[in-house]
Structures are given as structure tokens and as C-alpha cells.
């Protein structure tokens, strides 16, 4: 019986832990699969995906900077992908790609089940308005937060995300210059790539954003998350959480879409956490 082919597309993507995660899920569930990493620059993505499909590809994950391009290539995106305008999971069906976004479900599951956070009634600051932010924002709203403030270097992108979410009473955009005037938040989510340069000054955020309950969450992990988590600890946030748990949980959601069974995530998370020193970024 031929082994089904899966892959993660990104640029760069050689560092991705997704092949190892899905290999572990396959062993755990007894499902034989071939999962590889495929580097594709944005201008090469469409052709690379077509070649993958022609070679028998059944499903794919998509990471930076291709999530919005994957949405455009999806014949029938899911509701949550449509709201996000970004796709991180592709399923091949009847010769077409169906797009979904499991990032938000992965984040919420990690925060609520692994870390025991209750998101209901919380005020959230979302840093960033790109594909990563778009992927998690709808799920945070569904989890019961009361207000989301979106801040992005490009105000136009923040406005576009708020418009796409369609909840003007709960979601607003603000300028970076206004951070000192926004009050405090129970959840601060970094959905930017600012930490990739490992610049300790990249997150010189006002301490007034923090209260006694604040959880600071970086959607990246490992070296990429160091700068933001260092700020979170210096600001005395109650929780400083990286994106490793989200990575594993969103991968399990993707695996379930492809194979009809959701694997156990704690063993994989624990094994990866033990390898913490070699982790690079959340994809």
C-alpha cells in the first residue's frame, strides 16, 4: 500500500519541526505517511504546490510567508479560514485544494487546556495583523474575550483585520504610538516576526499594559521568542508562554483533518520541550 504524502511549505522552512511532529503522530496512531519540508518563495509557491499535487500530495501545512497565498489558492476555504483570510492547512479533495486554518484552535487549546487559562471576559492586545494574527484572532473571539485591540506597524493592515472580523463593538485598531494610552490587558499576543532579529529592544513595550493577571504569549518559540518573553518577565507578567504548545496543537488539528483521528499531544510537546535549546520558530 503506497504511503500518503504530506508536507509543510514555507520560506525558509528547513528549521521546521512539523515533519518530526507528524512522524510522531503517525507512529502513535499507526498511520503510515511521508511528511517533508518544501521551501518555496512566494513567487514559486503556486508551481511548487502543483508539483506536489501531481506527485500524489494529499495534504499540506503552510507557514510564513505563504498563508495568505494559500488562502487565495483554496477552492473552498473553511469559515474560519475565510474570516482569517489565511490558510495553514490544505486538504486535497477531488482534484482541488480545500483550505482551513487550525492556528487559532491550536492556540486556544494550548492556553486553556495546557496552561489552564480562562479566556472568557479577558481584554486582549494583539500585536501584528498579518497571517499569524489573522489565524488566531477569530478563535480568541470565539473563546469569549470581551475586547481585542489590534496594533500593527501598518495601521491599514490592522484596520483591514478588524473589518474582516466584523465585530466593531469588540475589535478595534490602534496606532503603535498609542500603546501608553490603551490601559492594561489580561492577554498580550505577539503575532509579529520582530523577534527573528533577536533584538532585545524590539519589544520595549510600556509596563502599563500589564496587570496582575496578564499572560504574554508569543506565537513563535525558541530563539525567535526570546526578546518578547524577556520583556514579559521583566514586566512581571503572570505568564510568559511561547508558541511551542500552539505548534503541536495546531498540528494535531491538521492531522485530524487529514486522517480522521486526533493524536495525543502531550507526549510530543514534552519531547520537544526537552529539546528546547534547538527550537527556532513556530511552524
Swiss-Prot record:
Binding, shikimate: 16-18, 63, 88, 103
Example GO biological process: amino acid biosynthetic process
InterPro entries from the UniProt entry: Aminoacid_DH-like_N_sf, NAD(P)-bd_dom_sf, SDH_C, Shikimate_DH, Shikimate_DH-bd_N, Shikimate_DH_fam, Shikm_DH/Glu-tRNA_Rdtase
Pathway the protein acts in: Metabolic intermediate biosynthesis; chorismate biosynthesis; chorismate from D-erythrose 4-phosphate and phosphoenolpyruvate: step 4/7
GO cellular component, one term: cytosol
EC annotation from Swiss-Prot or TrEMBL: 1.1.1.25
MF-aspect GO terms: NADP binding; shikimate 3-dehydrogenase (NADP+) activity
Family per record: Belongs to the shikimate dehydrogenase family.
Record-linked PANTHER family: BIFUNCTIONAL 3-DEHYDROQUINATE DEHYDRATASE_SHIKIMATE DEHYDROGENASE, CHLOROPLASTIC, SHIKIMATE DEHYDROGENASE
Protein name: Shikimate dehydrogenase (NADP(+))
Organism whose genome encodes this protein: Xanthomonas campestris pv. campestris (strain B100)
